[in-house]
Amino acid sequence: MDRKIEAVIFDWAGTTVDYGCFAPVQAFSEVFKEFGVTPTMEEVRKPMGMLKIDHIRTMLSMDRIQQCWQEKYDRPSNEEDVQKMYAVYEAKLLSVLDQYADPKPYVLEAVKELRLKGIKIGSTTGYTDKMMTIVTKCAEENGYRPDVWFSPDSVELKGRPYPYMVFKNMQELEVTSVANVVKVGDTISDIKEGKNAGVLSIGVIEGSSELGLSEEEYEALSQDEKDSLCKKVRTSFLEAGADAVILNMSELNEYIRKVEAR
């Protein structure tokens, strides 16, 4: 019997909006610098997709960052530091989020086609409800509005890689089986969230946090450079357990057609 996909659950920043996932990245970098530690882009992006306060905890647990912290403060970082950093981070992010809610290329077209097939649109995020109030409003003004969204606030702060936000989507959308759900994201924690939920977990390359480039930077690359970077991101997603990897949202509906025809 042919499979029928009932719902596609998208991530937000780096997946459906905010090409390159720059809003949170910029804020994390600035916060750590303010506290006297300059992180690399790799260190900032590695935990992307997690609940934002967990992201700060994860960065502080990285060997090099912790070493820099102890050199500056003569002690290890603690939870009080995490809370102070998060307060600064949240204020920074909330002040710029409205500038990072434009839908990525092919997103609106892909969502329209999904809806024409009767497929429901869900979403999960590493943002909090407070942050999402801004993002969802601006995204809707720009033409993107999923049927539902859930943040870690809705699952007792057990965000990615826990699967619970996916399950909340399924419950709200009245989906009958995890076998009929596709999760699409742009980070390793997105992939793990999908796998832990038992749904089909898809990575998207262009405009992803994993790729880490603005649209202008990406388009300025030669085809060979694009191919090389995309291959690296594809490998990262597959090694994390992705069921498939798409270049951009223009490939999503074709993937779903193939899944349903198996």
Positions of predicted regions on the chain:
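Asp-based, Mg2+/Mn2+-dependent phosphohydrolase catalytic module
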Residues: 1-6, 108-112, 128-262
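N-terminal helical cap/lid subdomain that shapes the substrate entry/recognition surface
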Residues: 3-108, 112-117, 133
